[in-house]
């Protein structure tokens, strides 16, 4: 049973085992009974106290061919086209649609290397580099514990690697859905960069990435033309995995990341040699938004990387994927939705409004602070979900004022104030409201197109 917060998608799996010993038995049998996820502690106690052991209703079960004991899926998932394969990634095979895939960047020190403000980020990173260099010269430097160390950074220190601040390493990234932040992109100060130095080129404005959460309790997908953080779609376990349109060799030359094998499979199935690799990229993005696909393969998507089915009317799905891609990547340039802004005066004893950043879905409102509320948010805007939150809720969560966990950041660099970004957030919410409504129109067309 899952315990935790259903709304936030956080939970822990709890199991109670009854082990029955029988010296005369050959082999073993496993019997299983489940309680509804997110049942609270009191209800679980009542469940056990109100049932006799023999009345709990255990079911005898066996693992399927993939080793899954529970939540077994009875569908054609294994027969679909594999999007990725570890052997293909390692150059030992070719049977996957994408050559490379990568986890999002895992910096190990987000508060040090991410920020809404480029100037604030520069200050933090210069301090970080300074302490690192002082520790490099003197292992007993008294201030060494002022920065966040991890295994990787300690390893680079042991290798005597010198560092200096480089302004050009500050780039825009997709930190969370519809939330861009500046990132100091650096091999040594970003704990795990995975494949990003092979799939990102700051001078190539044409590359795009499909990000999805693999192994999470709620599936989500988004596209970006920026570096993507590991936690972008991280809800209830799993990890954010990214599929690039292009990859790069050591000289920086662009290479198609969709394989010739993948192109051949799809062209052959549809008997259409005009299908391109960009078509396949857009088709993939559309399929991953299809509610029927998510419903049919719900159990598979909780533990496996998605696979690609062959839908009728291939080019219609390509077009839907292209429209979604343009909406989700260019969200800052879409027309803002016509929301109603209501401002009330501050109370006499208040100097500044207190940030709230709360959504009231029932009333169709977003309460930004003591002064400002956005009204008339259409109901379909709440339906565009990315994991366990809708797009608007992701924005509200990221712009809340939170005390930094790192003590040095809290003491020296805690400069974020919602008031400084309020008008920017209002504009962003209006535009992402448009994105949400238009996205749901396309998703509803997908649903109506299938029997």
Identify the residue ranges that each predicted region occupies.
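Sequence-level detector for compositionally biased, low-complexity segments
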Residues: 1-451
């Amino acid at each position: 049973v899952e315990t935790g917060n259903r709304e936030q998608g956080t939970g822990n799996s709890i199991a109670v085992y009854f082990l029955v010993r029988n010296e005369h038995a050959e082999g073993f049998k496993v019997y299983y009974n489940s309680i509804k996820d997110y049942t609270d502690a009191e209800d679980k106690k009542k469940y056990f106290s109100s049932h006799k052991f023999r009345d709990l209703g255990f079911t005898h079960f066996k693992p399927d061919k993939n080793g899954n004991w529970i939540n077994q899926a009875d569908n054609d998932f294994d027969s679909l086209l594999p999007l990725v394969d570890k052997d293909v990634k390692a150059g030992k095979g070719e049977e996957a649609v994408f050559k490379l895939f990568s986890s999002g960047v895992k910096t190990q020190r987000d508060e040090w290397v991410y920020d809404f403000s480029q100037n604030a980020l520069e200050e933090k990173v210069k301090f970080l580099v300074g302490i690192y260099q002082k520790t490099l010269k003197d292992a007993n430097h008294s201030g060494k514990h002022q920065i966040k160390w991890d295994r990787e950074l300690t390893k680079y220190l042991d290798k005597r690697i010198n560092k200096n601040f480089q302004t050009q390493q500050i780039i825009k990234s997709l930190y969370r859905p519809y939330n861009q932040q500046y990132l100091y992109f650096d091999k040594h100060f970003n704990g795990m960069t995975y494949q990003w130095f092979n799939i990102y080129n700051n001078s190539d404005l044409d590359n795009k990435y499909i990000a999805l959460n693999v192994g999470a309790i709620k599936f989500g997908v988004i596209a970006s033309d920026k570096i993507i953080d590991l936690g972008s779609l991280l809800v209830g376990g799993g990890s954010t995995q990214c599929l690039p349109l292009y990859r790069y060799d050591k000289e920086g030359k662009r290479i198609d990341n969709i394989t010739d094998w993948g192109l051949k499979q799809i062209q052959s199935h549809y008997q259409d040699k005009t299908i391109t690799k960009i078509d396949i990229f857009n088709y993939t993005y559309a399929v991953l938004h299809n509610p029927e696909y998510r419903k049919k393969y719900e159990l598979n998507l909780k533990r496996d990387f998605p696979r690609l089915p062959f839908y009728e009317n291939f080019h219609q799905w390509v077009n839907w994927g292209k429209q979604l891609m343009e909406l989700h990547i260019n969200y800052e340039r879409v027309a803002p939705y016509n929301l109603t802004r209501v401002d009330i005066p501050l109370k006499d004893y208040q100097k500044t409004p207190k940030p709230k950043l709360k959504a009231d879905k029932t009333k169709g409102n977003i309460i930004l602070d003591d002064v400002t509320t956005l009204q008339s948010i259409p109901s379909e805007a709440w339906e565009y979900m990315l994991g366990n939150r809708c797009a608007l809720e992701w924005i509200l969560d990221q712009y809340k004022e939170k005390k930094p966990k790192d003590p040095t950041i809290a003491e020296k660099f805690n400069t974020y104030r919602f008031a400084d970004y309020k008008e920017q957030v209002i504009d962003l919410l209006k535009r992402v409201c448009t994105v949400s409504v238009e996205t749901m129109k396309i998703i509803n067309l997908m649903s109506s197109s299938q029997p």
